[in-house]
A protein has these predicted regions:
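Polybasic, lysine-rich low-complexity intrinsically disordered segments
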Residues: 8-10, 27-28, 32
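Active-site-proximal beta-strand elements of phosphoester/diester hydrolases
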Residues: 80-92, 171, 186-200
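Active-site beta-strand/loop signature of hydrolases that rely on acidic residues for catalysis
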Residues: 81-88, 103-128, 194-197, 213-239, ...
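Metal-dependent phosphoester-hydrolase catalytic domains
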Residues: 172-174, 203-207, 215-225, 231-305
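Intrinsically disordered, low-complexity segments enriched in serine/proline and basic residues
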Residues: 4-6, 13-17, 42-45, 50, ...
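N-terminal, active-site-proximal structural segment of metallo-dependent hydrolase catalytic domains
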Residues: 31, 52-54, 59-62, 70, ...
């Protein structure tokens, strides 16, 4: 279930495809003949259908009727995706007790397609050598992808993604953090990119990180989502800067921290502007009522397209 990513990363490799992608259907190429019409089906097909007729009107009528029948039998399905962000504090709750089952239940009950996780230990002494992301992946039956931010306590500490769909590829991008090194984890899926980060407590580093993330998003031809613990309130200058590049999908009026009695919102889910945003609609957005499993409450957004 684990997909480790490279320790460092610079330039993203070129994307294979752009926009929202779906399995490509076979093209129908029509070529006129003297006494009728020839239809060649391609790619991957050697079948040729010859229709002999006096004119093209009958052929066009039959083609339209066949298309209408196909769409009636196999209508185009709109997509829907549920995104989450959760600072899990390494599976440790407000009671100071580490309980992976409790954390996993909070996630599983929401039935997300993809989850951005922050504050994950991997093989540290304080976690008894256990891998927090792997523990949660096993309990939620989701695929886990991890990115180290720092070496810590005999292991590492970082961020991760849980997803129903196995990522096509992933990338680890170091971000500035003078008090603690930060990281961006990018995962490409069939229809979109989904990313997670946990930004610095230093405003200058946060602003620099936002500019870096926006530059990376601009290179991606698919819709680009990013979620995480930004350590920033909605009225902060870096969040205002973020809004220049990204659309805020989650509700900043709903508080996320501290989990017991939330007083501020510092956890967000965003979508990069200009990446087919007109096709996406927010169906649901809320902060999940989870006061005990971590010191943050998780954020959930469901989008349709």
């Amino acid at each position: 279930r684990m997909r480790p990513v490279p320790e460092t990363g610079n330039e993203l490799p070129p994307l294979l495809s752009g926009g929202l992608t779906y399995p490509e259907g076979e093209k129908i190429l029509c070529k006129k003949r003297e006494r009728g019409t020839r239809i060649t089906c391609s790619p991957g097909s050697n079948t040729e259908l010859f229709t002999e007729m006096k004119g093209n009107k009958r052929f066009i009528f039959r083609l339209c009727a066949a298309a209408a029948l196909f769409l009636n039998l196999f209508p185009l399905q709109a997509g829907e995706c549920t995104l989450m962000s959760y600072n899990v504090k390494n599976g440790t709750g407000m009671d100071g007790r580490r309980d992976y089952d409790r954390t996993a239940r909070v996630i599983a009950e929401e039935k997300p397609d993809v989850v951005a996780l922050q504050e994950l230990d991997q093989g540290t002494i304080r976690s008894g050598g256990r891998d927090t992301l792997q523990e949660l992946a096993a309990r939620t039956t989701l695929t886990g992808t991890y990115a180290k931010a720092i070496d810590y306590s005999g292991g590492s500490y970082g961020v991760g993604i849980l997803s129903r769909e196995k990522p096509l590829r992933v990338k680890r991008i170091p971000l500035p953090g003078r008090e603690e090194a930060r990281v961006l984890l990018m995962a490409e899926f069939r229809d979109y990119w989904f990313c997670v980060t946990h930004l610095s407590l230093t405003r200058e580093d946060s602003s620099a990180s936002i500019d870096m993330i926006a530059a990376l998003a601009a290179k991606c031809s698919k819709p680009f989502f990013i979620a995480g613990d930004f350590n920033l309130t909605p009225d902060s200058e870096p969040i205002t800067r973020m809004k220049k590049y990204f659309i805020l999908l989650s509700d900043p009026a709903q508080k996320t921290f501290p989990a017991g009695h939330p007083k501020e919102c510092i956890d967000y889910i965003w979508m990069y502007r200009g990446k087919k945003t007109e096709a996406f609609h927010v169906k649901e957005r809320r902060v999940i009522e989870a006061p005990a499993a971590s010191d943050h409450r998780p954020v959930k957004v469901t989008v349709s397209y």
